């Protein structure tokens, strides 16, 4: 979200990658990091400790604690979570980096705004008022308000990520709206939403949640 909004309040140090047609085995991951270090871009990546298996919520993958060091000896310690992209039918945005030093070509793809929105929504629908990803609600508002979303692409993402997932209870926009209404009208949840550390837009909770619901109602005409 920081890359989209350019707002420091949505910045994070943690990194996430999904492999496409590449093994998640530890030795394959170590080889991948080794290849990146051969790019000669002035940054060296060091894996700290053991590679951990991740299995939480609806995510399976591996976690690496890594250290990034540049030519000026600046060091940043962070986490890198690596999963597998299971949704190849979703359109991705290609990111260009000079990786010509590598023997084999690597293409980095970024999730579209529609996929980012849909994955945040899926998590909220699944966990309801138990979800602790409060900033996601304000992310919804930002993406909608700033016209970052294509409605047709968004509906396609809903279909693939939510409607066709047997673990989800929502099969259409009406189901989503009903679920969101229940979440947004929970007094305890709304109180936490309003806290300054969650409300990165500095707007009233009423304005944000009402705006999001209105947008979802506008999608009902486009539902698959």
Feature roles, as predicted:
Residues 3-9, 19-224:
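Structured mid-to-C-terminal alpha-helical surface segments
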